[in-house]
Amino acid sequence: MTEKLYYRDAYATKFTARVLDCIEEKKHWTVILDRTLFYPEGGGQPADIGALGGVRVLDVHERGEDIVHTTDKPLPVGAEVEGEIDWEHRFDLMQNHSGEHILSGVICGRYGCDNVGFHMGKESITIDLNTKIPAEDLPYLEEKANEAIWKNVPVGIRYPSKEELAKLEYRSKKELEGQVRIVNVGEYDCCACCGTHVKLAGEIGQIKIIGAQNYKGGTRLELLCGKRALQEFRKKNDVSAEVGRLLSVPAVKADSAVKNVLAERDELLQNLNQLKWKYFTLKAEQVPEGTENILFFGEGLNSKDLTHFADLLLQKGAKRAAVFSKADEGYVFVLLSTEKDARAYTDEMKEPFGCKGGGKPDAVQGRVAAEKKALKKFFADKEFLIAE
């Protein structure tokens, strides 16, 4: 049985312990100590990382009553070793875990719902609630949670007796057996938890909701706390400042400026499309009457352009129209046929041109890795009129 020193003092970073066991498993070693400061993964909180006797601790998990440390090198059984946890990693987890407790407590207290899922990832935290949270309520909930930080509310930990526990209102995701560990944050939350936490809510710094979505009939929230929240704000602030600089407006007006740019872009695209359609119509009118098969080469045409132009050529009386546009490598194309034999052309182009694509008997599209000269010869041999 490993003594859990992290429950004595979540702020301690160094300790000494005796190696009870060390076994090689899949190119790593699993080490069991008589006592440890390393918190094992559990309850939604990732494991601590750090070093033991000069070797790296890569992961930590529970196995029965033992705490198992995964290391990159072996440690001698019976030796006394010095251990040190990565404090920056630990404190980040403490900030985010305590922040999650406060926000969950505020939400569950307001809506009478349950927190049915919790995951603390490398980038952010997600919490799953079994009720739908209105989007317009999120600013209030976020501010209420941060109120605990502003008041610097103490984060207390206690181990109530069965009698005390029976009278206590607390959150828990599952039925608990044995001694229950309760984490209490003033009026904001009371929850059964095995994780490490800050002593004062002020140490969390900030709780920020960065996303919300409907999930399994309830709501999934994404949040950041502490240093993560600061880094996210800094990143977004830098982005908005840069957008403002590029558009020559203050950062706070960047969204309006972007909307104006998008509106101008849409107008330009509309004008461009109108010019394209006029161009396609003009080129189609230049096709000699009685032309049954026609091949056209263009540049900068998208799938919609290719199809539209090929359709215009069919409307002019052609039976088959192949329209190609220069791409990064080779050409993209659309081939339409009133004779229902379009697939035959893509099949024939597979071997010589590496044709990739498909479609229906009367319409195919795809890509070829070929030069214009080779494509011209291929279609000329099939009695296509070449147009550019």
What do these predicted ranges mean?
Residues 1-388:
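A glycine- and charged-residue-rich anion-binding loop/surface
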